[in-house]
A protein has these predicted regions:
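Gram-negative (and chloroplast) outer-membrane scaffold detector with strong preference
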Residues: 92-193, 262-266
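Glycine- and aromatic-enriched membrane insertion/assembly motifs of diderm outer-membrane
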Residues: 56-143, 221-226, 232-238
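Outer-membrane beta-barrel translocator domains and adjoining extracellular loop/strand segments
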Residues: 49-56, 118-124, 189-199, 240-246
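Short loop/turn motifs that connect adjacent beta-strands in outer-membrane beta-barrel proteins
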Residues: 25-33, 98-103, 165-176, 221-227, ...
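Extracellular loop and loop/strand-boundary signature of outer-membrane beta-barrel proteins
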Residues: 76-79, 142-148, 195-204, 241-251
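Short glycine/proline- and aromatic-enriched beta-strand/turn motifs that initiate or cap beta-hairpins
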Residues: 24-97, 189, 256-273
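Bacterial Sec-dependent N-terminal signal peptides
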Residues: 1-31
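Residues that define the transmembrane beta-barrel architecture of outer-membrane proteins
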Residues: 31-35, 85-89, 150-156, 176, ...
């Protein structure tokens, strides 16, 4: 065998040996499965939206067009002097059924708040008191108008979760992951409103459905505690919302930012895979 061939084989054997050693050194240990739970707070921006009002007894069937809405954070003013459930909050309860490949499922709840901007000039078209209308009204509480999903627009999603491991220290005490989430579920709004001075009785109800996509960066410390920052897109469609002597329909898109803290709860002994 020539020296050239011997050198070639030695290089190949060396590469195989090196890759085997590196593989052995970088094998990660995963639990059989893993639960996690988190709590945090959010802020939102909403698309302009239409609200359709139907009050047959009053001869009303009209729409507020391209209404502006905003959130009500609550956490930006004396957060630690109020109940933790008053500001716009979030919680997540998740289960990674395959930690090695990063697959899991999650219950995902966002206590968001949607409020029609007070004082805006709102386009109004349709039928009121049995007569056709195409006008503009000043949407303000002083003029008998308000529309609050203020104790919650309340998005509930059942998500499929995929985790991608980005960075980890050798001892696993610092870990950075990316999580992609997608889901669908009901909306459970608290409905409070008044149109032309006719106010409803504020109440919670099952009010429609929503779909969402979420991108999350998760930093885990000492294997258990974690901090998350998430960006989320959601589309919510509300129907049969109870108003004074009638119902309302409403749909809008949401861009949401979320900051949360949480804890991982591994199940089963960690094994190298």
């Amino acid at each position: 065998m020539s020296m050239q061939k011997k050198g070639y084989y030695l290089i190949v054997l060396g590469m195989i040996f090196f890759s085997t050693v590196v593989s052995a050194q970088t094998k990660k240990k995963y639990p059989k499965s893993e639960w996690y739970i988190s709590w945090g707070y959010n802020t939102e921006w909403y698309t302009r939206s239409n609200v359709h009002i139907n009050q047959p007894e009053l001869g009303n069937d009209y729409t507020f067009n391209r209404i502006k809405g905003h959130d009500k954070k609550g956490w930006d003013n004396r957060l630690f002097r109020k109940a933790i459930s008053i500001p716009q909050y979030n919680y997540r309860l998740g289960y990674l059924f395959n930690p090695q490949k990063g697959w899991g499922v999650e219950i995902n709840f966002d206590h968001t708040k949607f409020i029609f901007e007070d004082g805006q000039d709102a386009s109004l078209t349709g039928k009121r008191n049995g007569k056709a209308i195409d006008t503009t009204v000043r949407f303000s509480k002083d003029d008998g108008f308000y529309y609050y999903l203020n104790n919650g627009a309340n998005f509930l999603l059942f998500n499929l979760v995929k985790r991608y491991e980005l960075i980890s220290t050798k001892d696993g005490n610092l870990k950075l992951d990316f999580l992609g989430k997608a889901g669908i579920g009901p909306v459970i709004p608290h409905v409070e409103n008044s149109f032309f001075g006719g106010a409803n009785t504020p109440h919670f109800q099952l009010g429609g459905w929503n779909v969402g996509l979420e991108a999350t960066v998760k930093a885990t410390f000492f294997k258990y505690a974690f901090l998350e920052y998430a960006n989320k897109l959601d589309y919510a469609r509300y129907s049969n919302l109870k108003i004074y002597k009638g119902t309302a329909k409403h749909a809008f898109g949401t861009y949401e930012m979320i900051m949360s803290i949480g804890v991982n709860l591994p199940v089963g002994k960690r094994t190298a895979l």
